[in-house]
Amino acid sequence: VWIVHDVSSQKDLSLSARDFLIGAVFAQTEPGFHTEALKAQAVIARTNALYERSRKPDSQTYDFIIDTDRYLSESQARERFGDRYEAYRKKIEQAVDAVGSKYMVYRNRPILAPFFFLCAGKTEAAEAVWGQKVAYLQSTESAGDLLAPAAESRLCFSADRFREVVLSRFPKAELENLSAEILSRTDAGTVKGIEIGNLTMTGQEFRALFQLPSADFDIVFDEQQTEIRCYGQG
């Protein structure tokens, strides 16, 4: 039994590992995905739960915190998925039961297991995202992600709208002649630095500014519009 602290109710709850994992898979991925994806998510959820339990201070009464991004109760899942709930639950239960008590370790300890929706063919190293090396979170090929329909997306803005978005955050920007230069990328393709007019910002800042699905992108300007091409999600 795991003791979890529910952010919404501010109460500590007792959950079996199996019940937590079912609710975690409901919350953390799309239940309509392939069963293998649900199995992977169940392993990730167990790994992260054990990682947090192993690091909690002695004075803490609960094992870890939950919210609706991390776990859905039965009533919350029913509300979110409606008529699809029963079929999804059966599918998730099968995935959770199939992986049993598997979890990921490094040097015999549970790892921190971050995840994302799609990469652009190569995952990112922890150092490129957090600025800190993590021995087991290294960049690796993931070519299968490129087969997904959502692997590439495009957003178009008029020149005026593009300027408006940038100026809302950087009112002193000089954008009379729209231009952009990507200054550097990580090995996985994520933009590290970009120059727009007289501005220099990080790829993550640009992503947040335009609410992009990814910081791996290209920008194309023409007389009519600005097109941002994004690769991957998350």
Over which residues does each language-model region extend?
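Conserved, single-site charged/polar hotspot
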Residues: 1-234
